[in-house]
């Protein structure tokens, strides 16, 4: 089979930045609790893209065995997805049999033919009911998936790109009556996890969900052009953004680990730090002017507080005095 796409300068730059960030992480250092939290985020986001109404808190409660009020179908989707994510990363990403087994795990009790390729034609519709894509004819689906996996298994392409292409082609083939988006996203993560185990725990789906319209637009543009370049670029941007979010998340954890420092701060200092910390958890860095607006304090007072937080290791600073930016510390 032939997958149409072009290697662009944008792709090369994104791949370089992704590889650079990956060298800074070690899966062994990631706490088991954080891995579980990221997996729950992945599940909730991937299901939300498919219109599951449950919140992150509700999904967490379901997975932890607590009762939740919600549509039975949505609850069943969460239970299935958690089982699938727990088992799929030991599967062979180029095995059609494993692919069908993963679909069965995701959809049993929800569709008529879980774990089976569809037997009828299928269309994808936009919000106005207009057909935007028609999947492959059902009689061709098994052969197309087999050809795709055989190509991917033997391709020398870097898995970063290959995983995007497999994801794209699965969405175009649309092999199942339901669950195609979930399977495409999950299978990309599986391929990536064979390249770097960290990808088993990265909540890529959360970033896709945050840019859901961009995701659909990239699919539509690449489908119309019969060229996956735009979709590959989009997914590489998603992967990079996910890694950048993880970097911020790890800084927050490190600060939390150093929380014993806080009792040594005076009450007002602790209050200001909590304000700054909450801001940094959302935005990543803060300047003196932003800190003044946030706290309502004078420039000199803010500088004194920020300098103190740097001194005790709660914050780090970069840049000149005038344009200095502060972020959560890592000592």
Can you name each region flagged by the protein language model?
Residues 1-331:
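FIC/Doc superfamily catalytic core
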């Amino acid at each position: 089979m032939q997958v149409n796409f072009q290697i662009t300068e944008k792709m090369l730059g994104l791949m370089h930045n992704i590889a650079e960030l990956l060298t800074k992480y070690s899966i062994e250092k990631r706490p088991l609790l954080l891995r579980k939290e990221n997996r729950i985020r992945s599940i909730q986001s991937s299901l939300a893209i498919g219109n599951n109404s449950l919140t992150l808190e509700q999904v967490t409660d379901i997975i932890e065995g607590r009762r939740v009020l919600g549509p039975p179908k949505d609850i069943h989707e969460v239970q299935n997805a958690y089982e699938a994510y727990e088992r799929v990363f030991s599967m062979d990403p180029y095995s059609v049999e494993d692919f069908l087994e993963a679909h069965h795990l995701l959809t049993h009790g929800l569709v008529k033919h879980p774990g089976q390729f569809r037997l009828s034609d299928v269309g994808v519709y936009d919000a106005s009911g207009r057909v935007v894509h028609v999947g492959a004819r059902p009689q061709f689906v098994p052969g197309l998936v087999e050809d795709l996996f055989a190509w991917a298994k033997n391709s020398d392409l870097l898995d970063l790109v290959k995983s995007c292409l497999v994801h794209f082609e699965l969405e175009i083939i649309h092999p199942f009556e339901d669950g195609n988006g979930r399977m495409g996203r999950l299978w990309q993560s599986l391929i990536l996890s064979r390249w770097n185990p960290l990808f088993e725990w990265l909540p890529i789906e959360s970033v896709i969900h945050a840019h859901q319209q961009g995701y659909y637009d990239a699919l539509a543009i690449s489908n119309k052009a019969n060229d996956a370049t735009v979709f590959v670029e989009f997914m590489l941007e998603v992967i990079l953004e996910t890694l950048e979010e993880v970097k911020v998340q790890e800084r927050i954890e490190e600060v939390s680990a150093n929380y014993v420092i806080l009792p040594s701060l005076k009450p007002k200092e602790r209050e200001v730090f909590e304000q700054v910390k909450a801001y940094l958890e959302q935005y990543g860095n803060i300047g003196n002017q932003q800190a003044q607006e946030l706290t309502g304090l004078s420039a000199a007072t803010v500088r004194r507080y920020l300098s103190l937080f740097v001194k005790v290791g709660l914050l780090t600073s970069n840049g000149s005095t005038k344009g200095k930016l502060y972020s959560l510390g890592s000592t």
